Amino acid sequence: MLDLFKAIGLGLVVLLPLANPLTTVALFLGLAGNMNSAERNRQSLMASVYVFAIMMVAYYAGQLVMDTFGISIPGLRIAGGLIVAFIGFRMLFPQQKAIDSPEAKSKSEELEDEPSANIAFVPLAMPSTAGPGTIAMIISSASTVRQSSTFADWVLMVAPPLIFFLVAVILWGSLRSSGAIMRLVGKGGIEAISRLMGFLLVCMGVQFIINGILEIIKTYH
């Protein structure tokens, strides 16, 4: 049981900086201004469900996609590392606020004409929460844990769905309490947290690239 908690904790530490629910909260507040409370709650729930589904598909079908297109594990690590590092750099040195992003502007225009527009899948679930970096991390991690013997087989079966479920629940709770979070943390607080998470992502991305290069060297050495 202790191994299960360790696996879940490790998974959350890896995924939460990538998913970054606080930036999704800022985006949600920019898009849901014309929605009533019931509609905001519905969009929050649907976004969380979509995030859970995307992560599950990435974990269990990611290897099949890699095999279909002939993508190697080192190649995935390097590509995923580049994506994660790029996302981290953008969070460290933001060029525009989340509410000013093209997705937010286009969706805001749609909301003016259609108050009940669906923003749960795009952009809240993808690419804001379960974006390319998150998906690449999940696929690469799935390949790594299946090849290692760090955890028991039953832990590797139970932990991933629980991790994805907890990420979805954290996102749902953050979106449901988005107004309170903004009042408590403030825009400056969210920017500071985003920059800290961005630095962590840059470090993770660089380590991904290093691991991929080392695997290539071992393969051809």
UniProtKB/Swiss-Prot annotation:
The gene is marC. The keyword Transmembrane applies. The keyword Cell inner membrane applies. Residues 29-44, 90-118, 176-196 are cytoplasmic. Keywords: Cell inner membrane, Cell membrane, Membrane, Transmembrane, Transmembrane helix. It is a multi-pass membrane protein. It is found in: Cell inner membrane. Its main location: membrane. Residues 1-7, 66-68, 140-154, 218-221 are periplasmic. InterPro entries: Multi_antbiot-R_MarC. GO terms for cellular component: plasma membrane. The chain crosses the membrane at residues 8-28, 45-65, 69-89, 119-139, 155-175, 197-217. Belongs to the UPF0056 (MarC) family. This is UPF0056 inner membrane protein MarC.
